[in-house]
Structure formats: structure tokens, C-alpha cells
Design a protein with these regions (language model features):
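Carbohydrate-active catalytic/glycan-binding domains of CAZyme proteins
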Residues: 1-424, 428-467
């Protein structure tokens, strides 16, 4: 029997940038629908919608399904000048697949349809009131953004919203009900989770709704997943009704790992975060949260990641930490070569929760967007740390790193970010990739690997190998 590939984080190739992932299981495969960033992009969501899928029993083997919907398919965007923002998909009463989305410059929700999960979607129509007025264009409507959809029987629940600080015209995430035609509103929008301007003194204060509405159902409970006012969190709320009565549940994941105290202080960010968007999905017996991370020191080159979660008997979900092995079902093999772009922790001796600092390490790639080159960690300066979690270490006696750059100094190897140094790897000035090896002793068991640079200059880290 062929060995299955290990499942890595990010789960797609390092040259692919699919944020805002909405995961679904159809016919034994996991499909992820998201927006499409570019490497070195200058705005969000510059690409057409593409889809990737994987067998539910082999989450390391992702297949590119191709472009499922080009931006100029929408009649309002024939010249392709507007971007396709984060979409969602639902199966309608007729068994077809309906793709809901918003264009970046319009306040409305568009819908496309396809007979298969990842075929060629065709424009279908716009969500509208019974008089034909498009949702978002009636007096008093809030602009539509980040649709989340759930179909039950002959009706579909549509959740949308965006709430920035200081804008009282945006109330929160709002839900309306669509008829079996998937377009016509039969119950008008109502706010279910407040934005920051309406959260003071409520259970939502500090974690009010910002964007990224997503809805799932587990047993008899509806889970509303959303990005909170601090942006880097994906939070959840629960209700026994899709139409309201939601109560704040907690944070599921933060893309800077804030609040996690299992390996660091809770208030220490361990990655460079920004906005976040994703949802939960059951794959086999397990549940996962899909989210995205930022790369290239930019808001506009985001990549999908996932972590295993546990929905407890009382319906609650504890926050999970960022790892390099999210879909793997356990730690990665503790021997072999691993690319540096798998770093789930990136920080310096001055940690920051948000991207953008000139001195921050960042995941990068050579070439232009679409070039199928493995990523690496670049802009590594003094005190920069890259962390990788987790590995099942067995009888490892040496570590090799592959690095380049005009820098001199050493990489320190640890199994805890603040633990003892287990090996040092001196590097030299070079503009080509060079290997550096050192002996190391690591106790057998499950460990992280942390690589910290101490020295002068700026270097890149391509990979490390455990032997």
C-alpha cells in the first residue's frame, strides 16, 4: 500500500494563496472555497476563484480543481476591474451548488451555480427583495460583505456584514432568509452579532463582530464563526436557532497565537497576524478550523491553514495553537527535510501581533506569483526566531539548515523558544543556498524545533533536516 503524504500547514503548495477558506465535505472529498490573493499583490483578492480538494482519508494530497469562476463572469464586472471577495457555497434544494460572493466595489450579493462542487460555475443572479430591489441597494440597507450561507430544507440562511471602528451605520452581522430559488428574500435582515459600535456592555465586548460571517450546524446547535474586532481572531457563537439568540463562545484560533499559554505567556504574540477568515468542518470523526495566515510582510498574500479542534460535550470549543501539522492527525515524522515556510511561529525579541515591521522575518518566495517555487523564511535579522511544531523525534543526532544571505552569525537550535540551546550552526556571507550541519542531542518524544538567528546582516532560511 502506498504511503500517504504527511499533511502540512499551510496545507496547499507554498506558491498558492487562497485565504478566507470555507471547507466542505462532498462525496468523500474536502473542498475549500476561498478568495484568491497574489504573491506581491497590492490589494486583497486579485485572482479568479479557484478550488482545491483532498480525499477525506488523505489530507496531505490536495488536487487543483482549476478556475471555477472568473471575475468577469458577473454581468456587473464584464471588464474584470473589480475583485472577487470571500465567497461561500451551499447545496440548494435542487442538489446544485450555489456560490455566493461580493465584488469589492458593490454593496450587493451575487450568486453563481454549478452541477458539481468544483466545475465551471455560471452566473445565476443577485440576492433581492420580493419587489426585485437588490439586497444592499434599498434605503437603509447595510452594504453586503463576506456572505455565509446554510441551506436547510427549502430555505437558505444568508449572513453578511462588515463593521469597522467608528462607523455606526454598520450594526453587525445580519441574517436574512432566502426562498428555494436561492435569490429571493422571504425574511428581511436582522442583526445577530453586534459590531464594535454596539458591543459595549454586552457579552460581545472585546470580541465584537468585524467580518467573515460563517455558519455551520452540529447536532442541534448552530455555530456562527466570525472575525472579531481585533482581526486576528476567529471566534464562535452558538444558538439553537439560525435566526438569532446567539451567545459568545470564545476564540477558536488567532493567527498570531495570542491568548495561548501552553508554550509561552498568553499575552505574547508568536506570529505576525492581521485579518482572519475561515470556518469549522467535520472530516471523518474529527473537527477542524480552517483559517489563514499572512506572508511576505503583507496584508495581501494570505495562505490557508487548518488546525484540529474538539467540540466538547457541552458544545464549547477551546482555542487551539498554531502548528505546522494541522491536518496531519498528529506530529510530523521527526526525521527528514522540512521547508522553512512551514514555520508556524515567527517573531523577534520584540514580538508584535501584526505584520508590517521592517525588521520582521516573513515567509517569501522567489519569482512572481504563480511560479511554482518553494517558499522560505526571509528578512531574518538578529533575534529572529522561526518555530516549527510538532515532530515525533526518535534518535536524532544531527541537524542541517539550508540558508543564504549577506549575514554572519549563528542559528541557535532549541525545542522550546526560551529553552536551552541544543546546537549552534554558524553561517557565512553567501548569495546562494548553502548547507550547515551540527551535531545535536534531543530526547526522544514530541517536540517543537525553534531556530533563532544571532548575528549581523539579513539572511534567508530555506529548510532544515533532522537525521
Amino acid at each position: 500500500m502506498m504511503m500517504k503524504k504527511q499533511a502540512l500547514n499551510p496545507y496547499l503548495p507554498s506558491w498558492e494563496y487562497i485565504p478566507d477558506g470555507e471547507p466542505y465535505v462532498f462525496d468523500g472529498r474536502v473542498y475549500v472555497y476561498g478568495s484568491h490573493d497574489f504573491y506581491n499583490g497590492y490589494v486583497f483578492c486579485m485572482g479568479d476563484y479557484v478550488c482545491w480538494s483532498a480525499p477525506v482519508d488523505d489530507l496531505g494530497s490536495w488536487r487543483y480543481e482549476g478556475v471555477i469562476y472568473p471575475r468577469n463572469e458577473d454581468p456587473e464586472n464584464k471588464e474584470g476591474k473589480m475583485c472577487l471577495y470571500a465567497p461561500d457555497v451551499t447545496v440548494g434544494p435542487d442538489g446544485r451548488y450555489y456560490l455566493y460572493y461580493a465584488l469589492d466595489k458593490l454593496p450587493i450579493i451575487s450568486v453563481a451555480v454549478c452541477d458539481t462542487p468544483a466545475g465551471k460555475y455560471e452566473f445565476y443572479g443577485y440576492v433581492h427583495y420580493q419587489d426585485g430591489t437588490r439586497l444592499g441597494e434599498r434605503a437603509g440597507d447595510e452594504p453586503q460583505f463576506d456572505p455565509g450561507v446554510l441551506t436547510e430544507g427549502n430555505v437558505t440562511y444568508l449572513y453578511t456584514g462588515f463593521c469597522g471602528r467608528g462607523d455606526k451605520s454598520r450594526t453587525g452581522s445580519r441574517v436574512c432568509v432566502l426562498d428555494r430559488d436561492m435569490l429571493t428574500i422571504i425574511r428581511e435582515p436582522e442583526t445577530i452579532v453586534p459590531g464594535i459600535e454596539y458591543a459595549a456592555g454586552t457579552e460581545w465586548e472585546g470580541h465584537s463582530f468585524f467580518e467573515a460571517s460563517s455558519i455551520r450546524k452540529h447536532a442541534d446547535t448552530y455555530y456562527f464563526v466570525y472575525s472579531s474586532e481585533v482581526m486576528h481572531e476567529l471566534c464562535y457563537a452558538t444558538s439553537d436557532s439560525p435566526l438569532g439568540g446567539f451567545h459568545y463562545g470564545g476564540v477558536i484560533v488567532s493567527n498570531c497565537d495570542l491568548h495561548i499559554d501552553s508554550y509561552k505567556p498568553a499575552d505574547m504574540p508568536a506570529a505576525y497576524g492581521a485579518n482572519n477568515h475561515g470556518s469549522i468542518v467535520q472530516i471523518g470523526e474529527d473537527w477542524y478550523i480552517f483559517y489563514h495566515r499572512q506572508t511576505n510582510g503583507s496584508w495581501y498574500s494570505r495562505q490557508g491553514c487548518a488546525e484540529k479542534i474538539v467540540i466538547k460535550e457541552d458544545g464549547s470549543i477551546d482555542q487551539v495553537e498554531l502548528t505546522s501539522c494541522g491536518l496531519n492527525g498528529g506530529p510530523l515524522v521527526g526525521k527528514g527535510t522540512y521547508p522553512a515556510y512551514l514555520a508556524c511561529n515567527l517573531f523577534t525579541d520584540r514580538p508584535s501581533a501584526y505584520i508590517g515591521g521592517d525588521g520582521y522575518p516573513k515567509v517569501m518566495q522567489d519569482g512572481k506569483d504563480g511560479d511554482e517555487y518553494d517558499g522560505y523564511v526571509g528578512n531574518i535579522q538578529n533575534s529572529a526566531t522561526a518555530g516549527f511544531k510538532y515532530f515525533d523525534i526518535q534518535n536524532v543526532s544531527s541537524i542541517t539548515i539550508t540558508a543564504r544571505g549577506y549575514a554572519s552569525g549563528v542559528f541557535e537550535v532549541r525545542t522550546k523558544w526560551d529553552g536551552p540551546v541544543l546546537a549552534e550552526l554558524p553561517i557565512a556571507y553567501t548569495n546562494v543556498w548553502e548547507d550547515y550541519t551540527a551535531p545535536i542531542t534531543i530526547e526522544n518524544g514530541v517536540h517543537a524545533i525553534y531556530l533563532t538567528f544571532r548575528g549581523q546582516g539579513n539572511c534567508h532560511l530555506k529548510s532544515f533536516e533532522l537525521k
